[in-house]
UniProtKB/Swiss-Prot annotation:
This is Ferredoxin. Its cofactor is [4Fe-4S] cluster. Ferredoxins are iron-sulfur proteins that transfer electrons probably in the CO-dehydrogenase complex. The keyword Electron transport applies.
Length: 60
């Protein structure tokens, strides 16, 4: 599963995860980054590595 802690996430002003994810799991919807295609996640952890606020949790 891929979860975003919205208390930590800076949303579209950051969007590092959106840009970094090779599977395009994340997308911007309004003022939030959302997990749009969780089933496409390959657990590569790039999103976790690039997130400056540690807002993303990935569990197989």
């Amino acid at each position: 599963s891929v979860t975003i802690d919205y208390d930590k996430c800076k949303g579209p002003e950051c969007a590092e995860c959106v840009n970094a994810c090779p599977m395009e799991v994340f997308e911007i919807q309004g003022d939030k980054v959302v997990v749009a295609k969780e089933d496409d996640c390959t657990f590569c952890m790039v999103c976790v590595d690039v997130c400056p606020t540690d807002a993303i949790t990935v569990k197989e």
